Amino acid sequence: MKTIITILGCGSSMGVPRADGFWGKCDPKNKKNYRTRCSLLITKGNNNVLIDTSPDLRLQLLSNKVKNISYVLYTHKHGDQTHGINDLRAFYINSKKKLNIFSNKETINYLYQNFTYLFKGAPDYPPILKKNIIKKKFSLGFQNEKINFKSIKIKHGKIFALGYVFKNIAYISDCSSVSEKNIKDLANLNTLIIDCLRFKVHYSHLNFDEVIKLVNILKPKKTILTNMHIDLDYEYLKKKAPKNICPGYDGMKIYA
């Protein structure tokens, strides 16, 4: 059974365009420059694994006609990865089953403290989520729809985020540097989906030149850029990057 990976959003924390309508260097005539905040969907049969609940989650799910969510993985606690969490209520209304969410202890604690009603319930609001601390290796789903994962601890500025490896694909949406251990975990990839914020250096994200250096070390067959700021026009970036590296876009699908 094939696995389908959908990039629901590939924009940086303010999206493209920003809320004030500013596109930066991105051509507004190119639909691939319209970027919602980072989120990913992995589909195998009826098993839908969502990575992160961006503030744009509702529109992302509607645009991609997503009718069910089986599990949710979180990369880290920042608002551009978590603040769409309330939209998960729709899937409890349909199934009447709590949704299992997974991440490291820091992220789970943040979600529980800030969205307590989703875990404990409130008047007229039943609890919809069940918290789980992530393991290094784990599987989600059943029988031929099961997906095997490996979680990787990745430096993201002052904190550590999680990257996920599955079916020789790695998803690392937020990253400032890669350790020797990370390099071993990311060996022999078919596809690397990687943070590439802008051309200038940033303390908590990789820039374009840093991504090129990393790709030359890891040597994945294909690299897709995500978490892109308004500096990075799709066509310009596509022409500038080597042939094995391309910018992602909202709605992009990868088949594995």
Question: How should these model regions be labeled?
Answer:
Residues 1-64, 130-181, 250-256:
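Core dinuclear metal-dependent hydrolase active-site scaffold
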Residues 5, 111, 223:
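Residue-level signal for inorganic ion chemistry
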Residues 11, 105-107, 228-231:
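Residues in the short beta-alpha loop(s) of Rossmann-like NAD(P)-binding domains
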Residues 46-103, 189-191:
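Active-site metal-binding motif and surrounding structural segment of the metallo-beta-lactamase
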Residues 51, 75, 173, 194, ...:
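Active-site flanking residues adjacent to catalytic metal/cofactor-binding acidic residues
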Residues 95-99, 107-133:
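Active-site neighborhood of divalent metal-dependent phosphoester bond hydrolases
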Residues 99-106, 224-226:
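Short internal beta-strands
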Residues 179-256:
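Binuclear metal-ion centers of metallo-dependent hydrolases, dominated by the metallo-beta-lactamase
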